[in-house]
Amino acid sequence: MIEGVMKEGFITTSYDSVVNWAKTGSLWPMTFGLACCAVEMMHAAAARYDIGRFGSEVFRASPRQSDLMIVAGTLCNKMAPAMRKVYDQMSEPRWVISMGSCANGGGYYHYSYSVVRGCDRIVPVDVYVPGCPPTAEALIYGIIQLQQKIRRTHTIARV
């Protein structure tokens, strides 16, 4: 992040680096727990793993207060429009983590008539966390991967 430090105590860096650093340390997730993966998501937020160390301290109930949606579980056809509506209500910039094989591709219920075969058919997904259910460590690794992806984005358009 820091390109140079002068003797007087000044730090020189780019605006993009500062803004992206701030974004990575203040992810406000909104839980979209649909099945058993949500239990592992709660486990990741508990005292043992404490995702607050990575800037995801408080799970928000309102989409207007969150910038990260964690989709955890099986998405059915009737729930898909509601999920899209919640995603559209989130403020920009917004990110999505697909957690578990059911959210990634339908999981065990892939061939069911009522299951969406991956939440990426409804909302754009930034990070996929595999597993059935994925462990809390896997979710934390997914959050770290998302933070690295955010650091690589450009806030200001280059001409």
Swiss-Prot record:
Localisation: Cell inner membrane
Pfam families: Oxidored_q6
Biological process (GO), any one: aerobic respiration
PROSITE patterns: COMPLEX1_20K
Transmembrane segments: none
Entry cofactors: [4Fe-4S] cluster
EC number: 7.1.1.-
Cofactor note: Binds 1 [4Fe-4S] cluster.
Membrane topology: Peripheral membrane protein
Any single GO CC term annotated in Swiss-Prot or TrEMBL for this entry: plasma membrane
InterPro entries for the chain: NADH_UbQ_OxRdtase-like_20kDa, NADH_UQ_OxRdtase_20Kd_su
Catalytic activity: a quinone + NADH + 5 H(+)(in) = a quinol + NAD(+) + 4 H(+)(out)
Molecular function GO terms recorded: 4 iron, 4 sulfur cluster binding; iron ion binding; NADH dehydrogenase (ubiquinone) activity; NADH:ubiquinone reductase (non-electrogenic) activity; quinone binding
Family: Belongs to the complex I 20 kDa subunit family.
Function per UniProt: NDH-1 shuttles electrons from NADH, via FMN and iron-sulfur (Fe-S) centers, to quinones in the respiratory chain. Couples the redox reaction to proton translocation (for every two electrons transferred, four hydrogen ions are translocated across the cytoplasmic membrane), and thus conserves the redox energy in a proton gradient.
The protein, known as: NADH-quinone oxidoreductase subunit B
Recorded name of the encoding gene: nuoB
